[in-house]
């Protein structure tokens, strides 16, 4: 995690212009659990990080975070949080995609959902088209409403399969 084990780094990142931070990237860190592991939830240090991010004005991004950790961040945060780039698991089951319940929960708590166009996570995988992306937007909007949805591109092109396999591992 960018903050390592230093709560003071949060304010430094804000001073450097950072406005949104991933709480986890696919795997466990000192804050909580990513989407590719058994989810142990938000840690005590994670609660401190959420509080400090709220204080300085950095938004918590839960795109790569596990379900339990996400729920606990949403409940802990005094400010809106986001899934800046995700897709609904109702159209394709994948650890990075979010369930209907997760999408509704974040929207019900004032959060935001950015629908990504990352083809491997769309309904038809790498064979997906713009129509599949439009379907994902409509599906998500029917759950969260038009005020809690946007475009969360996470656009990656020009890379081979090895790069995408690398993306599923811890950074």
Labelled PLM ranges:
Residues 144-166:
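Short acidic/histidine-rich active-site segments
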Residues 1-126, 134-141, 148, 170:
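Extended, charged catalytic domains and RNA/DNA-binding interfaces, predominantly
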